Amino acid sequence: MESIDYSKDIIEDAEKEVTEWASQQQKEIENLKSLEEYRRNFFGDISHELKTPLFNIQGYIHTLLDGALYDEKINLEYLKRAAINTERLHLIVEDLDVISRLDSGENPLEMKVFNIRKLASEVIEEMELVAAKKKIQLTYKEKNPRNFHVKADRESIRQIFTNLIVNSIKYGKEKGVTKVAFYHMDEYILVEIADNGIGIERKHLPHIFDRFYRVEKSRNRSQGGSGLGLSIVKHIIEAHGLTINVRSDFGIGTTFGFTLKKA
């Protein structure tokens, strides 16, 4: 009768387990390295973003203290510039606080049934004066869109509409158009916000939801804002367990789309 070598099977099983364990450990090490790199980059970005307005404010104030305060030709202008940079600093801190609360789950979602079209109309009305400065028209893709009821956190979705519409105005063309559209899907409503602005090059699309990511740093910084608007949008959508996507053609325009659960 032929004997069975159990020791060989045990050794093979042990080798397999060790190999799997080593592979898992390597993945964890790589993940930790990736997280550490992300942490370094993130804090470096925060430092850079805060330094810019702080240095500007400091420069204007010191210039005023050195005598410009009594020069009527420039004192008011320097105070205005300092105020603008103070507002930018405030925006960055406020948006960082929003992201921190979203990350930590401190702000649980208040899921309610509401009319998404009505909410969009409210935000459009609020943004019309801002859009008018660039003669941008805020409208719906359909002349008489139907009412759609969804179940979500209403104030968070308001923040999404606001951030995306502000983004479309900021990078929109003079006399351009931003359109909001709603589409029925099986269990969801697809919401799209499209503009005919400057668009985004394909190489930048995977990164536009990253914190502080700027397609063109000098141009974007001159546009103001915190650099966190789209990151906040992504956080809110993911908190709902859903996804957001973006399509863009450079020089033609950009469309953001996200889904919400039907009520």
Residue ranges of predicted features:
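Short alpha-helical segment of the dimerization/phosphotransfer core of two-component systems
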Residues: 84-92
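Short conserved segment of the HATPase_c
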Residues: 200-214
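Short helix-loop "hinge" at the ATP-lid/N-box region of the Bergerat-fold HATPase_c
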Residues: 168-169
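Conserved glycine-rich
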Residues: 241-242
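A conserved beta-strand-to-alpha-helix junction within the catalytic ATP-binding
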Residues: 110-125, 138-139
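Short beta-strand/loop element within the Bergerat-fold HATPase_c
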Residues: 175-187
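Conserved micro-motifs of the catalytic ATP-binding
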Residues: 104-109, 147-152
